[in-house]
């Protein structure tokens, strides 16, 4: 709250959170507004801090029967010896990914081909400021992304699916923000596969108690099984971003959607 020029007390009706990374996707802003009793447009501080923590969110998704990559968590200060490294590689064989456990935009992510590259890749991931790092199994397949937004009755609905064809080895920072990828909306896939992806996106949204607009990234592995790569509680919303492309394809007016999100946040 604040005092205006007339000396009257003013307050915010709602906070529309569009900050990527910390403090918008790790729960800090959400906790601040919760303490002030000001409504906001994402999930709760607990919800977004869970989706920001890849290891924790994957654990919950796996327990619910959703497919995710195998992963091993390394806390900052935990120095790996050769025996421990060999044990990890038995669980997660090469090639694999090393990535920050907290963070987004694919910053600090490395595709590791040899054992000698693992420790430098872990150091690279820790330089992003993350308190922990994941060694994660490599999933091979086509990548897709789908937004989930509130429908007319505020119940979540899945958007048309985007296929991502990256010019790089994976959908990294350059591919996401510098145009080094081709995006096809609506993805040219079977109705059966589209239904699986959209249903799993909605399951993840509800399981992790998301609110507002969210983007769920998938990779489809053998036998048309969609595995969840990441859940973005504050998805990109520029003209280049995936969710606005999906909204346009679905015929959803952006102004109408934002009004709906604000109204449902105030009513929550």
Task: Give, region by region, the residue ranges found by the protein language model.
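ATP-binding N-terminal substructure of ATP-dependent carboxylate-amine bond-forming enzymes
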Residues: 1-46, 50-52, 56, 74-87, ...
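Residue-level detector of anion-binding/catalytic polar loops
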Residues: 39, 67, 253
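Active-site nucleotide/adenylate-binding loops and adjacent lid/helix of ATP-dependent enzymes
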Residues: 9-10, 50-141, 152
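Short alpha-helical
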Residues: 24, 143, 238
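ATP-dependent carboxylate activation and anion-phosphoryl transfer catalytic cores
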Residues: 190-268
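Preference for protein termini
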Residues: 14, 66, 73, 128, ...
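Phosphate-binding site of ATP-dependent enzymes
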Residues: 113-199, 220-227
